């Protein structure tokens, strides 16, 4: 193990994050990560929940920070856990991600440095993309929440 690996700070608890399957005119916004975690993969915009912030407030803030869009969180659409380990089995990252179904309210996509690209796609048209694990299922569940809330 190198000195860099030994000096790396490992988490002591899971990191709580939110994401948003944002729907506009029957399409969902898919973004490609520009850096780790999930570098180069398509996923949903989102990020960490700050102390004192509700989950819905975190969704609104993270989406605005990453995409410049204004959204309305509709409902929780499931959960996802992402755990990565180093070669020795130590936990490098442990995310608990709560994806929300959300409606687009206003704005046009303008990405921050965390994201490389964004596309509005049909919810059923994700299979040709390299995505984070379970993205298709999350988008399907989110679409069901959007339709049920009409």
Regions found by a protein language model. Give the residues of each.
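Acidic, metal-coordinating catalytic segment for phosphate/diphosphate chemistry
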Residues: 1-19, 90
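Conserved Nudix-box catalytic region and its N-terminal flanking loop in Nudix hydrolases
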Residues: 27-65
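NUDIX/MutT-family hydrolases
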Residues: 99, 110-142
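Active-site-adjacent beta-strand/loop module that shapes the phosphate/pyrophosphate-binding cleft
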Residues: 80-108, 142
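A short coil-to-beta-strand element that immediately follows conserved catalytic motifs
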Residues: 70-79
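A structural signal for short, well-ordered beta-strand segments
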Residues: 20, 76, 100-102
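Conserved hydrophobic "DFG−1" position in protein kinase catalytic cores
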Residues: 22, 30, 102-104, 120
């Amino acid at each position: 193990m190198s000195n860099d690996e030994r000096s790396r700070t490992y988490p002591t608890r899971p990191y709580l994050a939110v994401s948003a399957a944002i729907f506009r005119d029957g399409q969902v916004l898919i973004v490609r990560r520009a850096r780790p975690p999930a570098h180069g993969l398509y996923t949903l915009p989102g990020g960490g929940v700050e102390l004192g912030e509700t989950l819905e407030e975190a969704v609104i803030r993270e989406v605005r920070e990453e995409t410049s869009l204004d959204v309305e969180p509709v409902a929780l659409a499931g959960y996802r856990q992402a755990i990565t380990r180093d070669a020795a089995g130590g936990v490098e990252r442990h995310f608990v991600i709560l994806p929300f179904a959300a409606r687009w309210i206003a704005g046009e996509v303008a990405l921050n440095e965390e994201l490389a690209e964004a596309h509005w796609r049909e919810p059923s048209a994700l299979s040709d993309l390299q995505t984070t694990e379970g993205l298709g299922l999350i988008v399907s569940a989110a679409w069901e929440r959007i339709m049920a809330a009409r």
